[in-house]
């Protein structure tokens, strides 16, 4: 039975010579569409591609195995329909060596084939979870003993702020969590250093240029748009037959309030926006009655307005709870202990890596970073492909990823 693809699915299957990102809900057929795209590439009458010229990566080994089975079955079916097709016969042979693997598996393949580029002992092995846990504990113990012995001002500040009177488990947990976050980034050392940039702001002008301020204004814009939709819908209901027209004055007042917020937000005036939100008094909904007004429509407007008010409340309390000046003071107060945390985490990363090299073991994060080191040369902010990357770009016609984790930036 032939599968009927939607127009969106057809685009994913047939689009060529461009990058494609597919976002869809679980169970919506993403993998089936990817398999069909692979088959369409293999069986393209004008530009047929050999299966081993496609790099296909999935999230789990089970998914990789299932995908290989699906592709094999589809090729077998096509070969059944065209038994004399030499290209299809060739694909049945090539699929056994095709790169249909996990992302970690592909990283391991890169390291095995290019280990000489990073001076890695080819006899390495992947460490077990229990072994890694013990190594981390040993490294952390030595690291903290050294830190207490040196009594660096930043470290002592960190301990005074976050350690309890009985133990320093909080410090250990914070270091390990920050380490895991750093290792999910393509360049952990740079990321750790960048974490401190905002805490080193000396002026409001510097604070306003921080990346997170841009994210804040993006969030503000999103909130404004949500409120505008609610207000517009409320006014439509007020003007509808049997609508609560007596509520129109209050909703028009909200519309003007929203316009004022948008104007201040467009000027990127943080304190101004905070003041507008803090000082605003809502116009009350009219208490007058009219028996011709639909009660259900009245309730709809009330609910929409309550939702709108909640947007402004969240914006005020979650995003603009302090003035910019107070925020700068708080950042300065946090600077020393957090610098201690970042420096301790960087030392832990260095010591943990050294311990793993000493035992000639790797973990999965190591594999991602070593593969990246093999493929990319970084000079300042400029990334250049290495010779290995150029070789691989010639080897593969297309790279397809079935699923990935957005928080693993080293993979993305």
Segments (PLM) and residue ranges:
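P-loop NTPase Walker
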Residues: 1-119, 355, 359-365, 370-373, ...
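Core structural elements
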Residues: 98-110, 161-184, 341-347, 362-375
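ATP-hydrolysis module of ASCE/P-loop NTPase motor domains
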Residues: 31, 92-99, 117-187, 332
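Conserved, charged catalytic cores of large soluble enzymes
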Residues: 393
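Residues immediately C-terminal
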Residues: 56, 406-407
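Conserved small/polar residues in nucleotide/adenosyl-binding loops
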Residues: 411-412
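Conserved ATP-driven helicase/translocase motor core recognized via long
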Residues: 53, 172-365
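Hydrophobic residues in beta-strands of the RecA-like P-loop NTPase core, especially within AAA+ ATPase
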Residues: 399-401
């Amino acid at each position: 039975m032939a599968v009927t693809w939607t127009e969106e699915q057809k685009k994913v299957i047939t689009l060529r010579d461009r990058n494609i990102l597919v976002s869809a809900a679980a169970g919506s057929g993403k993998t089936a569409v990817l398999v069909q795209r692979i088959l369409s590439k293999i069986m393209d009458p004008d530009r047929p591609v050999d299966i081993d010229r496609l790099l296909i990566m999935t999230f789990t080994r089970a998914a990789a195995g299932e995908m290989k089975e699906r592709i094999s079955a589809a090729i077998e079916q096509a070969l059944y329909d065209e038994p004399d097709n030499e290209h299809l016969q060739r694909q049945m042979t090539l699929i056994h060596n095709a790169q249909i693997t996990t992302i970690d598996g592909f990283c391991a393949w890169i390291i095995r084939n290019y280990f000489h580029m990073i001076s890695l002992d080819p006899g390495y092995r992947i460490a077990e979870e229990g072994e890694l846990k013990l190594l981390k504990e040993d490294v952390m113990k030595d690291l903290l003993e050294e830190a207490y012995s040196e009594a660096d001002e930043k470290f002592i500040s960190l301990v005074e702020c976050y350690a309890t009177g009985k133990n320093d488990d909080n410090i250990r947990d914070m270091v390990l969590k920050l380490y895991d976050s750093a290792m999910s980034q393509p360049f952990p050392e740079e990321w750790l250093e960048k974490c401190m940039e905002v805490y080193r702001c000396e002026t409001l002008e510097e604070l306003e240029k921080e990346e997170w301020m841009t994210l804040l204004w993006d969030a503000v814009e999103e909130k404004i748009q949500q409120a505008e939709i609610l207000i517009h819908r409320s006014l439509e209901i007020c003007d509808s037959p049997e609508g609560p027209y007596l509520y129109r004055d209050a909703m028009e007042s909200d519309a003007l309030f929203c316009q004022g917020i948008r104007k201040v937000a467009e000027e990127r005036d943080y304190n101004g926006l905070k003041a507008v939100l803090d000082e605003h008094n809502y116009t009350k909904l009219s208490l007058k009655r009219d028996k011709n007004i639909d009660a259900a429509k009245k309730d709809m407007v009330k609910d929409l307005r309550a939702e709108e008010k909640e947007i402004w409340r969240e914006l005020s309390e979650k995003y603009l709870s302090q003035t910019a000046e107070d925020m700068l003071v708080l950042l300065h107060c946090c600077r020393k202990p957090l610098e201690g945390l970042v420096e301790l985490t960087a030392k832990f990363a260095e010591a943990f890596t050294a311990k793993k090299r000493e035992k000639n073991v790797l973990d999965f994060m190591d594999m991602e970073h070593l593969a990246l080191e093999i493929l990319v040369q970084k000079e300042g902010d400029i990334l250049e492909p290495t010779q290995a990357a150029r070789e691989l770009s010639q080897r593969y016609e297309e790279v397809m990823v079935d699923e990935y984790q957005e928080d693993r930036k080293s993979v993305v």
